[in-house]
Amino acid sequence: MSRILKSLSRSYSTTSPRLYVDVVQGLYISSLKSYKPKAVPSETAAEVKEWSMPSAPTAPKYDVDFTSALNSYKYEGETIPTKAAGESNKFDFLESYENEKEH
């Protein structure tokens, strides 16, 4: 007898969460439809400043003569250090070696 009651109770069960979702959704939609935004008072319009275009920037003017400054600089000597005859570089393995035998 208990097997029959269990099978009958399963067939008559309803899903209450679906009904709950519809009620909540209905309340939410009705509150959205009834919403009316507040009117903006004219006082807030006075608080906003009018936008004006900024003035165009001007190029700076210097009193220095750049040509004479560049001519006064002269490249003197070699500034790149050279390696000694027996000294090896840690990046020597990156150099490509030429194959003496032709294919």
Swiss-Prot record:
Any single biological process term in GO: proton transmembrane transport
Compartment(s) of residence: Mitochondrion; Mitochondrion inner membrane
Protein's UniProt keywords contain Mitochondrion: yes
UniProt keyword Transit peptide, yes or no: yes
Transit peptide: 1-26
Keyword terms: ATP synthesis, CF(0), Hydrogen ion transport, Ion transport, Membrane, Mitochondrion, Mitochondrion inner membrane, Transit peptide, Transport
InterPro entries reported for this sequence: ATP_synth_F0_suH (IPR019711)
GO cellular component, one term: proton-transporting ATP synthase complex
UniProt subunit comment: F-type ATPases have 2 components, CF(1) - the catalytic core - and CF(0) - the membrane proton channel.
Function: Mitochondrial membrane ATP synthase (F(1)F(0) ATP synthase or Complex V) produces ATP from ADP in the presence of a proton gradient across the membrane which is generated by electron transport complexes of the respiratory chain. F-type ATPases consist of two structural domains, F(1) - containing the extramembraneous catalytic core and F(0) - containing the membrane proton channel, linked together by a central stalk and a peripheral stalk. During catalysis, ATP synthesis in the catalytic domain of F(1) is coupled via a rotary mechanism of the central stalk subunits to proton translocation.
Family stated for the protein in its record: Belongs to the ATPase h subunit family.
UniProt name for this protein: ATP synthase subunit H, mitochondrial
Source species: Schizosaccharomyces pombe (strain 972 / ATCC 24843) (Fission yeast)
Gene: atp14
